[in-house]
Amino acid sequence: NILSHDVLRIERLITDYSQMLKDEVALSKEKMKKINIEPIIQSVVEDYNNIQTVKKNIKIHYENDGNEKYIINGIENRIEQIITNLLDNSISFSKEGQNIFVNISSSFDRKIIVKIIDEGQGFKENDTTKIFKRFYSNRPDKFGEHSGLGLNIVKNLVDLHNASIKATNRLSQKGASMEIIFPKV
């Protein structure tokens, strides 16, 4: 009886949390404005390089295709959160001394493409859409426990920006690639 009561309580908490996120998304849409995401992403990469060089000797390489502006309708701190969560994930699956690459580019069809590529172990699953589901985690025990919410939050924030995200394994080498495609303004 106590166990079923606790299960119901946890289900209510999850439902309340989901509703809170939906409400936040609705409010966030009102706060959207034209922003250049390039300096935001570059700043996050610089901050991480200062931390990770000391922590795991991981180097994060940043590159853009030379365009001056990468303008989207968005919310600055949410873009930071997307990049931060993805870098945290890449770092956690990377060994000491490995590299992570962050690229931003514009396409001819009015899209802005952000890629985060690591040299870690890559994804185990063939269907990488699973990794964006709430509470999904495939981490080996050696990586410690995680909530399985990080990539789900990323997916929700990407959706908020009317963007898309795709996870793939690198074909020629070990590692994973995350690609976000934003509509350009």
Please tell me what each predicted stretch does.
Residues H5-I10:
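Short alpha-helical segment of the dimerization/phosphotransfer core of two-component systems
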Residues V25-E30, K69-G74:
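Conserved micro-motifs of the catalytic ATP-binding
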Residues K31-N49:
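A conserved beta-strand-to-alpha-helix junction within the catalytic ATP-binding
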Residues S90-I91:
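Short helix-loop "hinge" at the ATP-lid/N-box region of the Bergerat-fold HATPase_c
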Residues F123-F135:
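Short conserved segment of the HATPase_c
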Residues G150, V154:
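Short alpha-helical Gxxx[C/S/T] motif in the catalytic ATP-binding
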